[in-house]
Amino acid sequence: MAARAQIKLLPEMFQSNGCASLEDTKSTVSKVQTRTERFQERVRKHIDENYSEFMTNHTSPDIFLEESSSLGREINDLLETVGTEGLAALNGSSTQLADHSRELRELMLGLQVSEHILKIDELFQCVEEAKGTKDYLVVLDLVGRLRSLIYGEGEAATQDVVRIFQALECYETIKVKYHVQAHLLQQNMQERFDRLVQLNCKSFPNSKCVTLLVSKEEGQLHDIVIALFQERYNPVRLCEFLLENCIEPLILKPVGVECNENAEAGTYVQLSLSYSTKESGTASGTSTQLRPNYKQVLEHFRLLLQTLSGINHSLSSSQHVFSIIGDHVKDRMMHLLVNDCLIPAVPETMEEYQASTLCEDVAHFEQYLADSFLINPEVDRGLSQFIEQYGTYYRNRLCSRVLESTREIIQRDLQDMVLVAPNNQAMDVTGCDPFLFPRCMVSRSAQDFMKLMERILRQPTEKPGEDEADPLAGVIGMMLQTYIDEVPKVHKKLLESIPQQSVLFHNNCMYFTHWVAQNANKGIESFPALVKTLQATGTMHFRVQVTYQTSILMDIMESFEFESPHTLGTGPLKLVRQCLRQLELLKNVWQNVLPDNVYNSTFVELLHAFINELVRHIFTQRDISATMASDLSDLIDVVLEKAPKLFRDPHEVHQVRSWMKLQQLKTMMNASLKEITELWCKGAGPLTANYKADEIRYLIRALFQDTDRRAKAITQIM
């Protein structure tokens, strides 16, 4: 029943599509097949002539495309005649008709392949026509469509059509022709671009001249730039030229810039750059070269970008020509701009800092670069970070400048000195006002050093915010610490060998200590520690010199010897006079340099050491004759006469602890046994202030012969 129903259904289907019977359908299919095969043969011949034999062929692919469309419609009509249900009926009644249906589908696929090739051929001809009119955007579009058809990109054809097409013999030839056309297009566009945008560089022995010419024909420039950059253009050569010959020199060198907006009879905008290529003669390279002013650099940059603005067209919603160029140059450009132009332009003084518009200028320039699409400010934050760190850069520059000045002052001779506080006498300092600095000499360099510190304190600083560091914080401490650390190194030999040098360094440190204390309320950081360090450093080097001078006296006195047990001889007197001369020399270099109280206390110490050594040597003599006692008395007289003259006020000599001891020793050299015992007065006399009983007994034994009277006197020394 089902089979009879299907057979009954078939005539109705064929009649509705213009076929009276199955035989008519077979005949129609056969005719279409024959026509299609003939058509494909003609298409094959056309393709062979164009892509295999490369013969001249004036046949337009349009004729083939129209015929292909007509055949396609007929085949589609036949396929509709034998639909899904009809095909099932045919399968049940006639395998032959089903085969014809499949043949129709294969014919249709072959026809589609032919049509695909014809479309490619038509596009090749359109490319040639568009090239004649130099309409590069049209050519670019046609070449893009060619690529889609040849490589099966997008929805240009079904996968079956592309698969069969790419398996044909003509495919490789078509592909080669496409690549030739694409290369010629790229070459022609590059040549045209090079005529519209001319980049020239002339090198001379010590200089270079760079010229940029950009056409004012906006329409042509727009089309060629859009076409060139959309066709996978590699801008490396352009970017390298701009970076090497324009951007880097503008940042690193003084550049002569000339702009002519009506060059070449008004058809081009011209920018000329000229600069020296002579290398610096020092190893430090660019650091010693004359740097251009940052304002000049930014202005020249604007001129460069304005000159090239004619090529800065939009390629897409998110990309411009400058953004492509920026991808190649911005890292190097930003690095040089920040490190070699902007950071060196940061002010070094507070006056310059307050007058500077550097941050505002950089912010405006960054916005200009962003508006030109050369950078993306959200990603390329080099200039923003410079602005954020501007305070730190300023502080570093200020400290570097101050440190440089500090080191220059430290190198100066300490011996070049100047009087300070000339009216502050010792009695005024110790009595009236202990905060006065005493009259003394300091190095002229120390005075210059103090002036530098005062200048820093006078800087008109604004109160920093909560998150903003005071740019001057710690600068004074850094300067003084550098002075403390560096002076002993720089002047090491002189500090060790020349007495006046160490004294001046001591005075300098005390001078700075007094200044720091006076300015403690002005925000000097680590004030107590600085005062202690300055005092300790100055005192230490001074004490080293005092110890050295004491050792000189001790070395002289080490040769102190009596000529014989009975006579003193001339040697001891010479040694004593030599010590006094040494002290006299020291007085000449110290008295007018040190503050009076320091000088007095120092000479009190030196005299005490000298007198003690003299007394010690006298007490080593076990037998002192009357003649020798007289000579010793005269020798002591020399000391008693000369020592007071070492002080401005001779009475200062009484501050020497061993002074009275020496005077009493002279008295005992000339005294009788009775007088000595009376001076002792059973331990209550004046001798007890400076001598012990053992020392007096020893001296009595040395001065007097062994008698009952001497023995009795010795028993009284208790």
From Swiss-Prot:
Pfam families cross-referenced by the UniProt entry: ZW10_C, ZW10_C2, Zw10_middle, Zw10_N
Secreted among keywords: no
GO cellular component terms attached to this protein's record: cytoplasm; nucleus; RZZ complex
Localisation: Cytoplasm; Nucleus; Chromosome, Centromere, Kinetochore
Main location: cytoplasm
Alphabetical GO biological process terms: cell division; endoplasmic reticulum to Golgi vesicle-mediated transport; meiotic cell cycle; mitotic spindle assembly checkpoint signaling
This protein's UniProt keywords: Cell cycle, Cell division, Centromere, Chromosome, Cytoplasm, Kinetochore, Meiosis, Mitosis, Nucleus
Keyword Transcription: no
Family: Belongs to the ZW10 family.
Function text: Required for accurate chromosome segregation.
Record protein name field: Centromere/kinetochore protein zw10
